Amino acid sequence: MNNSEQFLSPRMGRVEQIHFVGIGGAGMCGIAEVLHNQGYRITGSDLGESGTVQRLRSLGIQVYIGHRLENIKGADVVVRSSAVDFNNPEIVAARELMIPVIPRAAMLAELMRFRHGIAIAGTHGKTTTTSLVSSLLAEGGLDPSFVIGGKLNSCGANAQLGKSAYFVVEADESDASFLFLKPMMAVVTNIDADHMDTYEGDFEKLRTTFLEFLHHLPFYGLAVVCLEDEEICRILPAIQRPTLTYGFKEEAHYRAINWTQKGMLSEFVVVRPAPHKQLTIQFQYPGRHNVLNALASIAIATELGVDDDSIVRGLQKFQGVGRRFQMLGEKQFEKGAAIIVDDYGHHPQEILSTIDAFRRVWPERRLVHVFQPHRYTRTQSLHRQFVDALSLSDELLLMDIYAAGETAIPGVTSENLANEIRSRDKRVTIVSEQSLKATLDEFIKDGDVILMQGAGSIGQMAVNLMKNM
């Protein structure tokens, strides 16, 4: 199509006004923004003010603070975040009024239905890979729409309505809602144990659900999967769709060779299937895991006909994603200056990948790791893996578990986690938001790097730490 022409998807029947319950969530706000830009009247509600809520209001979207039945007035459909309980007064009122109530993923699937959908799935790396794919397609002139679970730094948003039919989305396995999607192309970055309550504690069920997701592709679609992941290799023979692989292994269709890390700069060569030539890639995102994320995006971009120069340039220009190994700056503490890095990682494997990237970027610096565990269920089910991963920090400051709406589980505490790490002759300090600054003043030496990591409120703490010093 001519990129000067706006791709128009059919309207959703009689739907004019759409209400989002939990509109401030990472998965909700982007969908709301895209629908707003398509001309629908959007309203929403959330529990509190946030930067996301303020941004939505700046676009002209009505956002209410608090959940009340009158908030849904005029709505033709109500979209529910997975974090919202069915007893929510707005959900109850909508059902009584016979207004359709649908999950977030169902609306995302509807947005994708008439587009060329590209869905990025996997336990780790979804947000970064979705951002990379969106950036490379944009650099190549394809002008995609996208909905991402994090803020793309280059545009300061996690969603955009492009002119073309291409639609890049982050596909969420946490509640198995990615099964709503029927994309044309799909990436699976890895399969790891997380959100196991969704899968009744059965890893085989998790594995087969990812396979089912790939089989939502049409017979002429394309699966792009990581050959470095053991669980993907296990399902690979069962994938009954055209498939390309990526990784460091010689048999991968898209292969990285000669990878070097020079500070924040990753440099490597990509070997691609004939007739495509090799590409030398440089981008400012450290770590082996991010080389793999880049490979996935290169595979998608190449298969969609993005020219080589645009791929190379797009990766060079990539400015990253909010809260993914994000350097906030350097700040002075009582005993010296330290760099502050903010990161969303909340799973042991993500901690390991981040620490590995840290050691490659700053091999001579000391890592002061401030970690906020996220969810009691995750902390309980992955207790041993958390102990192993967190023991690799030079100094560990551990915060209380961020509940994320869960009920506390007896015996599952940060103190218990700390005690087991201490049994390995590692120093662990329990800190609160109130005591964090004073503790850092005591601990920090000149040249240290502070890693503020977790999926809860710690991201805002990192921002506040930079502002208030």
From Swiss-Prot:
The gene is murC. ATP binds at residues 122-128. PANTHER family: UDP-N-ACETYLMURAMATE--L-ALANINE LIGASE, UDP-N-ACETYLMURAMATE--L-ALANINE LIGASE-RELATED. Its EC number is 6.3.2.8. GO terms for molecular function: ATP binding; UDP-N-acetylmuramate-L-alanine ligase activity. It catalyses: UDP-N-acetyl-alpha-D-muramate + L-alanine + ATP = UDP-N-acetyl-alpha-D-muramoyl-L-alanine + ADP + phosphate + H(+). The keyword Nucleotide-binding applies. Keywords: ATP-binding, Cell cycle, Cell division, Cell shape, Cell wall biogenesis/degradation, Cytoplasm, Ligase, Nucleotide-binding, Peptidoglycan synthesis. HAMAP family: MurC. Cell wall formation. This is UDP-N-acetylmuramate--L-alanine ligase. Pathway: Cell wall biogenesis; peptidoglycan biosynthesis. It is found in: Cytoplasm. The keyword Ligase applies. GO terms for cellular component: cytoplasm. Belongs to the MurCDEF family.
